[in-house]
Amino acid sequence: MRVADFSFELPDELIARYPTAERTASRLLSLDGNSGELTDLQFTDILEQVNLGDLMVFNNTRVIPARMFGQKQSGGKLEILVERMLDDKRVLAHVRCSKSPKVDSIICLDGGYEMIMVARHDALFELELQSDKTILEVLEDVGHMPLPPYIDRPDEDADKERYQTVYNQNPGAVAAPTAGLHFDDAMLAALKDKGVNTAFVTLHVGAGTFQPVRVDNILDHKMHSEWAEVPQNVVDLIAETKTRGNRVIAVGTTSVRSLESAAKASPEQLEAFSGDTDIFIYPGYQFQVVDAMVTNFHLPESTLIMLLSAFAGFDEVKNAYQHAIAQKYRFFSYGDAMFVTKKAN
């Protein structure tokens, strides 16, 4: 398939640049992958889409304030976007400036902190913090929330809360697992009251999630790598859920990719998983774990819309997106959501 097959025209006014006043105030488009049937709902109606005994799997990564500003010793301004924390002092990062910093050069950050450029790894720079503080402490002090480029505004204080799930736990993401942004504590309690079980995986979303696919044929695309973990207790809950005949519902494409990465690593029987994953899911993929998913509306020609097309059918997703645009759903990270059931293999 061609990347252009996943293109669509989106009016600029449908890009959500701010979240709704309340997390659950978004709209929800339900898509049945088998029939293609679409239903316009409110996000709170998700309670009617799930059943007693279903298992909802969330990504509990925490977004770090990964964007920092500073200057080189020469005085040239630069912007750093952390891609991955290597340890308490070292990071892999994207560096934007007029001329790339050289190995062993010093970068002066806002707040008086300094980093040394240790090495370059393709498009990424390995930087080491020169401070008694940890990199996380420095990010919390002078870092900015790494809003996606299409939001096209400076980050604000409110983004520290709203570009973060309420159940976040493990710091490391530089982009939010956005399907989870719609859930508040009251909604999680309501799911529990209905008898829906919950479980948590971790996938530290990288900045690569926003990188365009730069090839014509999707088979030529090299997926970026991210760290993921599926604990043993989640594996056990999945087995119990499947045995009962209930569904595994992944909240977000990152939860889907975590679970399917675990299945790929142990194809005979699902096992706990921890490590890097570069799984690329596109039409033709046979899902091993996930039966339904909650997801936001994705960028045209992105690997995420390819994943959704693999899950619910290419034509079905294309039709759903045309419907969403006609009905003026809000798109991307701060936008509305979908509840999607899998198309039978």
From Swiss-Prot:
Catalytic activity: 7-aminomethyl-7-carbaguanosine(34) in tRNA + S-adenosyl-L-methionine = epoxyqueuosine(34) in tRNA + adenine + L-methionine + 2 H(+)
Protein's pathway: tRNA modification; tRNA-queuosine biosynthesis
Catalytic activity, EC: 2.4.99.17
Gene3D superfamilies named in the record: QueA-like
Keywords from the UniProt entry: Cytoplasm, Queuosine biosynthesis, S-adenosyl-L-methionine, Transferase
Gene Ontology CC annotations of this record: cytoplasm
Enzyme class: transferase
Any one Gene Ontology molecular-function term assigned to this protein's record: S-adenosylmethionine:tRNA ribosyltransferase-isomerase activity
Domain of life: Bacteria
Main location: cytoplasm
Protein family (similarity comment): Belongs to the QueA family.
Primary role: Transfers and isomerizes the ribose moiety from AdoMet to the 7-aminomethyl group of 7-deazaguanine (preQ1-tRNA) to give epoxyqueuosine (oQ-tRNA).
Protein name: S-adenosylmethionine:tRNA ribosyltransferase-isomerase
